[in-house]
Regions:
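N-terminal Rossmann-like or analogous alpha/beta NTP/dinucleotide-binding catalytic cores
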Residues: 1-164, 270-272
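Alpha-helical recognition segments enriched in aromatics with Gly/Pro capping
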Residues: 15, 22-39, 173, 177-312
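Short, surface-exposed, charge-dense and proline/glycine-enriched linear segments
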Residues: 63-68, 100-116, 162-178, 194-210, ...
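Residue-level "edge-of-site" marker
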Residues: 77-79, 141-143, 169, 199, ...
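Generic domain-boundary/flexible-linker signal
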Residues: 82-84, 148, 167, 197-200, ...
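Short, surface-exposed, charged/polar-biased interaction segments
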Residues: 85, 92-94, 145, 170-177, ...
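Extended, charge-enriched helical/coil interaction regions that scaffold DNA-processing
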Residues: 129-132, 145-194, 207-210
Length: 312
């Protein structure tokens, strides 16, 4: 009976990292540094599922280093995401007026951080620090303000028709056949999801938009009616999830990112956008299951049925 060699220290993370290295070699990309990423949701209280994503990514980083490669974990806070609903247990803060606004523009209801989004991010960062995870922290609001994704945004918006058709083909979502996959922050009311991009003026790198009522979940969020233009190189706005991962991967040179099965559709589309539109081979992935509560429901920041990393 033939013996098989042990890969690294013999864990599934070693096997995964070995596959990642071989894939990078076959793609002919530089192996000087192999960056891995973990996305941090900032719209509600982070839980052990959020910590688990970062732990997986950090495990891959350590395995890559054990193989002799330099690696870095980027912990990316999606703090430009809009507040879609008020998490359970936070109704006393009267956050209704801030629905659809980026969480980085909402005041911290607890009064200890510069925004609601940074308060939520800090809870998870504290958890990462407590378990000894080393990372480089990046915020979405700074990433967009500094124009780090401006070239990717431009390319994506130039190809919005093609992307909209592909999204419909891959996952059956038709909204981006009509709308651009980009949300400017309305200059009048500071809301994100109410500002619908209607046209991209490529030579000026501006989107035309109108702020109107939208339905989020079962709630109607009122738009202010403003119509205007937003410069993608300097005005605040963000890409839709169906394309934003791809822009980040390309801009930050990400080679690995795990994902939960609840966002499979978004990853499928982003992989295609990364490969075919941005010309950046998508990162190596591993899919994972969700943490469930004792009733069998997925733990959720918005539902409030969470166990934080601190409590764990």
């Amino acid at each position: 009976m033939s013996e098989q060699g042990v890969i690294g220290k013999g864990t599934w993370i070693d096997k995964l990292s070995s596959e990642l290295i071989e894939r990078e070699k076959s793609l002919g990309r530089s192996l000087d540094i192999l960056r891995v990423e973990s996305g941090l949701g900032a719209s509600g209280i982070p839980h052990i599922g959020s910590l688990g994503d970062a732990v997986r990514a950090y495990g891959v980083k350590l395995a890559l280093e054990n193989f002799g490669y330099k690696s870095e974990l980027i912990a990316y806070s999606d703090d430009l995401d809009g507040l879609r609903k008020i998490p359970e247990g936070m109704q006393q803060f009267n956050l209704d007026e801030h629905l659809a606004k980026p969480v980085s523009l909402i005041p911290d209801p607890y009064g200890c951080h510069d925004s609601y989004g940074m308060h939520m991010s800090s809870i998870l960062l504290d958890g990462l620090d407590r378990v000894g995870i080393k990372y480089e922290f990046r915020r979405a609001v700074d990433t967009y303000k500094q124009g780090l994704l401006k070239d990717q945004i431009h390319t994506i918006l130039q190809n919005s028709t093609k992307i909209g058709e592909k999204i419909a083909e891959l996952v059956g979502q038709e909204k981006y056949q009509k709308n651009l996959p980009y949300f400017p922050v309305c200059v009048n009311c500071s809301r994100l999801y109410t500002a619908e991009s209607t046209e991209y003026i490529a030579d000026e790198r501006k989107v035309k938009y109108r702020c109107h009522d939208v339905e989020i979940g079962s709630k109607i969020i009122k738009g202010c009616g403003h119509e205007g233009e937003a410069d993608i190189t300097k005005d605040l706005g963000k890409l839709a999830w169906k394309v934003e991962f791809a822009a980040r991967w390309s801009a930050f040179d990400i080679r690995f990112e795990a994902y939960g099965k609840d966002i499979m559709d978004s990853v499928k589309v982003n992989d295609w956008v990364s490969d075919e539109i941005l010309g950046f081979p998508h990162p190596h992935h591993v899919k994972y299951e969700m943490f469930l509560d004792k009733g069998g429901k997925k733990i959720s920041k918005s539902l409030g049925n969470v166990v934080t990393s601190q409590r764990w």
